[in-house]
């Protein structure tokens, strides 16, 4: 899980999801998981 100021889709499988006010990127590739912080 990378914590970044700006989260971006890295590949076409990445999805941007907002959970409890936190923006996250979910992907089939675990290296692409991010959250905004």
UniProtKB/Swiss-Prot annotation:
Domain of life: Bacteria
Entry annotated with the keyword Zinc: no
Keywords on record: Ribonucleoprotein, Ribosomal protein
GO molecular function: structural constituent of ribosome
Record field: transmembrane: none
Disulphide connectivity of cysteines: none
UniProt gene name: rpmJ
PROSITE patterns attached to this UniProt entry: RIBOSOMAL_L36
Entry keyword annotation includes Ribosomal protein: yes
UniProt cross-references to InterPro entries, sorted A to Z: Ribosomal_bL36, Ribosomal_bL36_sp
Family designation: Belongs to the bacterial ribosomal protein bL36 family.
Protein name as it appears in the record: Large ribosomal subunit protein bL36
GO process annotations (BP): translation
Cellular component, GO, one term: ribonucleoprotein complex
